[in-house]
Amino acid sequence: MSDRRTFLKKTSLAGLAGLLPMTSLLDGNFDAPSVLNKDSETTWADGSRLVVSVSMQFEAGGQPDNAESPFPQNMQKGFIDLPGASWYDYGYKEGIPRMLDNWDALGIKVTSHMVGSAVLKNPKLAKEIVDRGHEAAAHGMNWSSQYNMPYETEKKFIKDGVDAIKKVTGFTAVGYNANWLRRGTNTLEILQELGFTYHIDDLSRDEPFLIKVKGKDFAVVPYTLRCNDIVLVEGKNFSADQFVRQVKMEFDQLYSESERKRRQMSISFHDRIGGTPQMVSATKEIISYIQEHKGVSFKRKDEIAQLAYADKSIIRE
């Protein structure tokens, strides 16, 4: 993931914008669209008041040599960053197994975005994720950027990742997440052609919606940077307590809004970050807090996409 630190710095600035009072956004000529008066049309079809979507990124093992890590990026060419590699190894040796046990203890199912090469390197772990009832979604074959790939090259890149997941787990991925969300102008057409039903590379809403791709409906299940460990913990150096506080504040606001409109909350964890002892403890506190509230359901992203397709009141763009 090249330029990761630059990306994280930029998202830090974007996060500050989210702390501005809403009145500051409305002082000019900006007209905020409102659907608050459409109570009966914007609830979840299954009766949920608020739906929470948890992501577990399975990337470790698929990273390139000398990928960015917490260590200084000053390795000379021709040498291997051994401690950096061990940081990634933690993701599949300790991180995902610990998170899987935590999901079981909490009684929730998540969506795991799997890098194809990581799956092939750790097939037993990938299969265990699916065997425990979680969704396997595609995340490319490796950490390459795909936005600049020619059509057929990108199609093969995506399909190779899907095939790896299918071969190892028996699960056919229907959801997609590009490297750093950076899809290209051809990506959605390719996904539709390959049989995908949704993608998550969009930050524009706090609820799912449908778009048209070559005249056919395609679901968008929005992702998050605000409740994302790679942005907050690795990027902004949040402590576990700060992470808990921010995610709880996000939930409280969305839960309040969900009394009047359809709301989705997304939380994202990465194998080598979200799977550390303190972060799993923080996650347990967050999920337990959310579960204390009536009307909240936890759903895999493929389930959310299916609800979107079946809902006549879903937003269409």
Please place each PLM-identified region on the residue numbering.
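Twin-arginine (Tat) signal peptide motif
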Residues: 1-8
